[in-house]
Amino acid sequence: KRGVTLREDDRFPCNAGNCACLPLDSYSYTCLSPTSSTANCESDECVSEDDW
């Protein structure tokens, strides 16, 4: 569904309520709170579980 990642499955990688950010300098997702800045995320977005 998303770009190249190191994840081996398609389950949402974060806890409920958080969102997944793909840092510009990394291929693995990091988890952010919805209030965090997404300036360092691919496409400036943090993907919620609903949108995963």
Swiss-Prot record:
Location (main, coarse): secreted
Keywords: Disulfide bond, Ion channel impairing toxin, Neurotoxin, Secreted, Toxin
Location(s) in or outside the cell: Secreted
One of the record's GO cellular component terms: extracellular region
Annotated disulfide bonds: C14-C31, C19-C41, C21-C46
Tissue expr: Expressed by the venom duct.
Gene Ontology molecular function: ion channel regulator activity; toxin activity
Cleaved propeptide residues: 1-6
Domain notes per entry: The cysteine framework is IX (C-C-C-C-C-C).
Function: Probable neurotoxin with unknown target. Possibly targets ion channels.
Protein name: Conotoxin Cal9.2d
Organism: Californiconus californicus (California cone)
Lineage: Eukaryota, Metazoa, Spiralia, Lophotrochozoa, Mollusca
